[in-house]
């Protein structure tokens, strides 16, 4: 990830338009900003969300609210609570997200 030609700025995430992305179950609401090749998102997963695909994109992710369970293709599962994060490189380890009955809110950079 190269951060170049990004002037100092601030984001009021409540002003960023949200888009809905359906999961296998539930949905995700994304508020997205693009800074050159860097995508920055505030994502709210609905209760009982399950991603509809195995993701191979790299991310740095921080849980802000709720619980996020990340399942890796090799069978490992990790549950993150608010204040916890993970990082994974592009094409390193396929993974998918799910939430429990409370949903989750995340900050993601990729």
Regions found by a protein language model. Give the residues of each.
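Short, conserved beta-strand element in jelly-roll/cupin
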Residues: 45, 54-70
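Short acidic-glycine-tyrosine-enriched beta hairpin
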Residues: 74-91
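A short hydrophobic beta-strand segment most commonly corresponding to one strand
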Residues: 85-88, 101-110
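Conserved short histidine dyad/triad with adjacent acidic residue
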Residues: 36-55, 89-92
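Short beta-strand His + acidic residue motifs that chelate non-heme Fe in jelly-roll/DSBH
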Residues: 52-53, 70-71, 88-89, 93-101
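A short, N-terminal "cap"/entry segment at the start of jelly-roll beta-barrel domains
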Residues: 1-41
